[in-house]
Design a protein with these regions (language model features):
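Transmembrane-helix boundary and interhelical linker motifs in polytopic inner-membrane proteins
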Residues: 1-2, 18-58, 75-81, 114-121, ...
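Interfacial/gating helices of multi-pass transporter permease domains
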Residues: 1-17, 48, 148-153, 187
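Small-residue-rich midsections of specific transmembrane alpha-helices
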Residues: 9-37, 56-63, 100-106, 162-165
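Short membrane-interface helical motifs at transmembrane helix boundaries
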Residues: 64-83
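Alpha-helical transmembrane segments of multi-pass membrane proteins
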Residues: 82-106, 135, 152, 160-161
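Membrane-interface junctions at transmembrane-helix termini in multi-pass inner-membrane proteins
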Residues: 98-126, 139, 149, 170-173
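Alpha-helical transmembrane segments of multi-pass membrane transporters
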Residues: 124-147, 161-166
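Interhelical loop/hinge segments that connect adjacent transmembrane helices in multipass membrane
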Residues: 148-154, 166-187
Length: 187
């Protein structure tokens, strides 16, 4: 109901307000990758990609730790959440945090796809993401469980699927971006 909508908006909002970071990180990572792609130096490109992956893993870890410390405190002590929905609010926070972490670690793979101008892949994954979110919204109508928690679980799963699609595509199709590095010539 109305309370659940408000809880989701506030709790997930604590995490998603940092979503602007993903756009900025993706744009800058894409620029570095595209620049090195233009140099046609596969070693430099691989180093740049590996560095981007490592930086984003570190950012994800630090964000996770900070959110666990500050976010949980805010939910349990600062926000005015009905007592009977506090457990659900904590679960929503955890699933929203998972969604956020997947978003961060997806950035280098998304940026590599864009840097290589594989817009068909980007569009396909975006369509899959949108369709899965539509299915998630429909499943809420039939859910015999706490819909607030179920929705946040579905969004976390969709975020994981989106990450996996980018990860698998990059690892299989963009040979210069394989982790660990392998010796390949530029396409």
């Amino acid at each position: 109901g109305i309370d659940d909508y408000g809880i989701y908006g506030v709790v997930a909002g604590l995490i998603t307000m940092f979503g602007f970071m993903n756009a900025a990180m993706s744009s800058s990572t894409q620029r570095y990758l595209a620049f090195n792609l233009g140099l046609k130096d596969s070693i430099k490109l691989q180093q740049t990609f590996t560095t981007a992956v490592n930086i984003h893993l570190l950012i994800a870890l630090l964000s996770f730790l900070l959110a666990e410390a500050v976010g949980l405190w805010a939910i349990n002590h600062l926000l005015d959440i009905p007592t009977d929905r506090l457990v659900a609010a904590n679960k929503v926070f955890q699933y929203s945090l998972i969604t956020f972490v997947f978003g961060i670690i997806q950035v280098p793979y998304h940026a590599a796809t864009i840097a290589y101008e594989r817009m068909n892949v980007y569009a396909s994954i975006s369509i899959v993401d949108a369709v899965l979110k539509l299915i998630a919204a429909y499943l809420l109508l039939m859910a015999p469980v706490d819909r607030l928690v179920f929705y946040s679980q579905l969004l976390a799963a969709i975020s994981g699927i989106s990450f996996l699609l980018y990860f698998v595509y990059v690892q299989l199709q963009l040979k210069e971006m394989v982790i660990p590095p392998q010796n390949h010539s530029m396409n």
